[in-house]
Structures are given as structure tokens and as C-alpha cells.
Amino acid sequence: MVGFNRRFAPQVQKVKALLAGAPGPKAFVMTVNAGAIPANHWTQDPAVGGGRLLGEGCHFVDLLRFLAGAPIAAHTAVAIDAATRDSVSVTLMFEDGSIGTLHYLANGSKAFPKERLEVFAAGRVLQLDNFRRLTGFGWPGFSKLNLWQQDKGQHACAQAFVQAVRTGGGSPIPLAELLEIGRVSIEIEESLR
């Protein structure tokens, strides 16, 4: 199993549950203030670390795919820095009409949160800040879900895998989705070359 842990985070699970009751297409805005890494760092080397989009950015493609609950129908991407391609804006279009933008940026301030997700659906908004604060705007019966410490779902992801192995159950992330995320992430990376 690929460790796409963010989909297992408790606040993401809450977002998914809330979206189940929101009719129509959704719009997702994922901002990742990833920070700069030198061009000669191993994560920037496509042969070793795969590059930052393949190495880390794919996690956010997975997160948006999970929340949309529909396959990715099309995608576009642009990058600021041609040398490292680590300040990227990606647009995803989903088969259900939902859209998502991923802003994976290496040129921001460390004073700004690293990961922020905004979801717009059915006249309502959800905002997840750094996997600590989830705030709802216009959601009947829901206004916030805050955690004492950040939880990006690593433990729940590992638990789901172990449980599947113990019980002989299916993969916690369907193989078709894993292959789709991998294919789309590679296509995005290749489109930036």
C-alpha cells in the first residue's frame, strides 16, 4: 500500500462525511507552503527522489481525488521555476464536475501554515489549517473540529493497512485509485518538462 496518509486524518474523514450530504460539484483549493529545498538536494533529483511533485505533491493529488470521490478527468499544470519545478500550480478536473487546484509552493514564508485546504460546496465552505483546525462556514450542525496536535493520518493509515492484512480484507486505498494517482502525478510532472 502507498502511504497516502492524509485521507486517513480525522479532520479529512470529517470533511468527507460532510461532503456526502452536499449535492453538486465541489471546488477544492489546496495550498502547500512546502518551503525551499536546494536544487542539488536528493529530493530534487528525478532519478533518486523523483522530484518534489512526485515525492510529496502526489499526496495532495490523492487527497483531492479522495474528497472528490470521482476519477480525475483532466489536469493542467504550470511552474514558476523551470530548474526545480517546486513552485507549481495544478488544476484537476473530476468526472463529477468538481474541480481542484493544488498550489505546491517553495517560495513562501515559514510563518505561514504549511498545508491549507479549502472546500466550497453547496453554498458552504470548509477550511482545514495544517491538520489542526477545521472550520465550517454555513454547515448546519457543524462549525469546527480542532485538535490539540497535528494529525495527518499516518497512524490511522498504518492501522488500516495492518487491519487489512490481519483480516485478509482489501487494500484500504483501492488499487485503481493508487494507479490513477500515480499515472496523473507522472503526467503532471512530465507536462512541466
Model-found features: residue ranges?
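Alpha-helical elements of Rossmann-like donor-binding domains used by nucleotide-donor carbohydrate transfer enzymes
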Residues: 10, 14-17, 63, 89, ...
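C-terminal helix-rich "cap/oligomerization" subdomain common to oxidoreductases
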Residues: 95, 160-193
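Contiguous beta-strand/loop segments that form the cofactor/metal-binding neighborhood of enzyme cores
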Residues: 55, 61-133, 158-169
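Active-site loop of classical SDR/Rossmann-like NAD(P)-dependent oxidoreductases
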Residues: 148-159
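A short, polar/proline- and glycine-enriched secondary-structure boundary/capping micro-motif
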Residues: 111-116, 137-148
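Predominantly a Rossmann-like dinucleotide-binding segment in NAD(P)-dependent oxidoreductases
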Residues: 6-78
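Beta-strand-loop-alpha-helix segment that lines the small-molecule cofactor/substrate pocket
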Residues: 1-4
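Short aromatic-enriched loop/helix-cap "lid" or pocket-rim segments at secondary-structure transitions
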Residues: 12-14, 38-43, 87, 114-115, ...
